């Protein structure tokens, strides 16, 4: 059966329990929001195919449990991830403070070239805000990571967050492919051309006695 996509990108949502990872996933994959979601047990995933630069990208998005008891299970999924979103709740100071711990987990378990993004979720609840947008931006700048505030409930910046991460992965992938093609061309130039084999001409002489 022919593939219906050009590339498959594996994305991961990590962060403390209750920050809204599952809600973000459902908003992006199904454009739905449900206030009765229970905490993810272990790990779950959704799929959505998007088009970027004329290519169909299948996004396989994994939603991880934030509870400590599932940490061993969830870190096993870091290795194959091409993009990781670290999510905190703007109404929960502790979830923001723990972003640094989640970043350390990524450094320990994920690929060194994984694309990363920090999301400050629940920005629709501004009246209960404990973490300013400026603090979120500063943290992201300190680690050289992109940052967005999102709201799964109000559908604010959810689409933009996932598409931005996918586009960053695509850009890095294209760069690697171009570098590989360039290296192959350089290697060919370095290799000395093969000389065509020449058959030795055998000359025969006739001796005649006069």
Curated annotation (Swiss-Prot):
InterPro entries xrefs: P-loop_NTPase, Small_GTP-bd, Small_GTPase, Small_GTPase_Rab
Main localization, broad class: membrane
Cellular localisation: Cell membrane
UniProt cross-references to SUPFAM superfamilies, sorted A to Z: P-loop containing nucleoside triphosphate hydrolases (SSF52540)
Alphabetic keyword roster: Cell membrane, GTP-binding, Lipoprotein, Membrane, Methylation, Nucleotide-binding, Prenylation
Residue ranges listed under propeptide: 208-210
PROSITE patterns xref list: RAB (PS51419)
Motif (Effector region): 37-45
Gene Ontology CC entries for this record: plasma membrane
Modified residues (Cysteine methyl ester): 207
Membrane topology (UniProt): Lipid-anchor
Cross-referenced Pfam families: Ras
Gene3D superfamilies assigned: P-loop containing nucleotide triphosphate hydrolases
Positions annotated to bind GTP: 15-22, 63-67, 121-124
Lipidation, S-geranylgeranyl cysteine type: 207
Gene Ontology molecular-function annotations: GTP binding; GTPase activity
NCBIfam families cross-referenced by the UniProt entry: small_GTP
Entry similarity comment: Belongs to the small GTPase superfamily. Rab family.
Protein name stated in the entry: Ras-related protein Rab-8
UniProt organism field: Diplobatis ommata
């Amino acid at each position: 059966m022919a593939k219906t996509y050009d590339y498959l990108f594996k994305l991961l949502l990590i962060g403390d329990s209750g920050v809204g990872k599952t809600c973000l996933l459902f908003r992006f994959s199904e454009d739905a929001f449900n206030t009765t979601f229970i905490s993810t047990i272990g790990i779950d995933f959704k799929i959505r195919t998007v088009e970027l630069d004329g290519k169909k990208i299948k996004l396989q998005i994994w939603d991880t449990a934030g509870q400590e008891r599932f940490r061993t299970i969830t870190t096993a999924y870091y290795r194959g991830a091409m993009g990781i979103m670290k999510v905190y709740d703007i109404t929960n100071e502790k979830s923001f403070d723990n972003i640094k711990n989640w970043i350390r987990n990524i450094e320990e378990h994920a690929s060194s070239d994984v694309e990363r993004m920090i999301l400050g979720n629940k920005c629709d609840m501004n009246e209960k805000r404990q973490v300013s947008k400026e603090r979120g931006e500063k943290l992201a700048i300190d680690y050289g990571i992109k940052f967005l505030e999102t709201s799964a409930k109000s559908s604010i910046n959810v689409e933009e967050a996932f598409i931005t991460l996918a586009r960053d992965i695509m850009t890095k992938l294209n760069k690697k492919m171009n570098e590989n093609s360039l290296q192959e061309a350089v290697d060919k130039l370095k290799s000395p051309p093969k000389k065509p084999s020449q058959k030795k001409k055998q000359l025969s002489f006739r001796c005649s006695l006069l």
